[in-house]
């Protein structure tokens, strides 16, 4: 490569924003599941980020992280997609893309659709056969939200 030529081995926009979503997920205190989201406008500007966790003012140390039982994390935890949508302090999210490390559940799909986000780019769909994700895909499809699966390669995950 000559000094006057640009580098050819740089990452794509999708890899970049999914990497940011993955990094956001690393902020989650959930011992079992860490999910991150990054919302981007059509000009590739980051609008908002989020990760799964408890609402503001709800202590990570006082509320349970248990997955089962009468008192479990599902009563308290906010998913990364909803956190990213609620964290946005600008105007409209109309036409935006959300990058998320795990395919959105049905509740997050509703928020994605209502916010005007037009594309979901996801890295993992491990719950694809669950009623929640089946409903999510049905709603997103009906609303015309584009779905794109992107797998980030291990060297990219490690920053190499």
Residue ranges, per PLM feature:
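Zinc-dependent deaminase catalytic domain
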Residues: 1-153, 157
């Amino acid at each position: 490569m000559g000094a006057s030529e640009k580098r050819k081995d740089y990452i794509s926009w999708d890899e970049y924003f999914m990497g940011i979503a993955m990094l956001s997920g690393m902020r989650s205190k959930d011992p079992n599941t860490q999910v991150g989201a990054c919302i981007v406008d059509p000009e590739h500007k980051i609008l908002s980020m989020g990760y799964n966790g408890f609402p503001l003012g709800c202590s990570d140390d006082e509320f349970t992280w248990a997955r089962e039982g009468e008192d479990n994390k599902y009563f308290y935890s906010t998913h990364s997609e909803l956190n990213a949508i609620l964290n946005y302090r600008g105007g409209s999210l109309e036409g935006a893309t959300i990058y998320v490390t795990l395919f959105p559940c049905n509740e997050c799909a509703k928020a994605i659709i209502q916010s005007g986000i037009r594309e979901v780019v996801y890295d993992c769909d491990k719950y694809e056969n669950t009623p929640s994700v089946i409903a999510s895909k049905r709603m997103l499809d009906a609303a015309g939200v584009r779905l794109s699966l992107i797998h980030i390669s291990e060297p990219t995950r490690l920053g190499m």
